Amino acid sequence: LDAAQEARDQKRVRWIGFHGEKSPHIALKLLARGFAWDFACMPLNPFDATFRSFEKQLLPEMIRRGAAVIGTKALAGGAIPAGRLIKSEEALRYAWSLPVSSVLVGCDSSAVLKKTLKSATGFKSYHAGEMDALRQKARPTAGDGRFERYKTTQEYDGAPGLTAHGYTVS
């Protein structure tokens, strides 16, 4: 972090941020070190509100600090079964309705890109009642993290993160 701060002071780097998807508790420990982060990337979707919630725990802290928030995993990393539970358009609108600077959306085909762009065209924020309705819709299957495997498995973890948290790297 000292090197990052030095680079920012020398105007070689403009913004310094972090990306966390495993647990908001890990990110909050990072914030407790006192570094002045400019932004954080975090998963934000209707399922997140029920299980290890970045929306409830980390998002408010970043806003309190005046830092930008970049949403990720609006579609739960592609884990939401097509046409079931929450539609992709609903999940995107949910993430865009939160107090974020941007939302990164993974597109693995031109069809997904077109669908995402169509959802963004004419976007209107959900009101609080609509946001809560989507959280409630997700709640019955969200409590165990089954649609947020980046939180519950090591499938998405790189070797540095695994090593830092005491896991064996194979």
What are these language model-derived features?
Residues L1-S53, Q57, I63, A67-I70:
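Glycine/proline-rich, positively charged
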Residues R33, A49, E55-S170:
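Structured C-terminal cap/extension of enzyme domains
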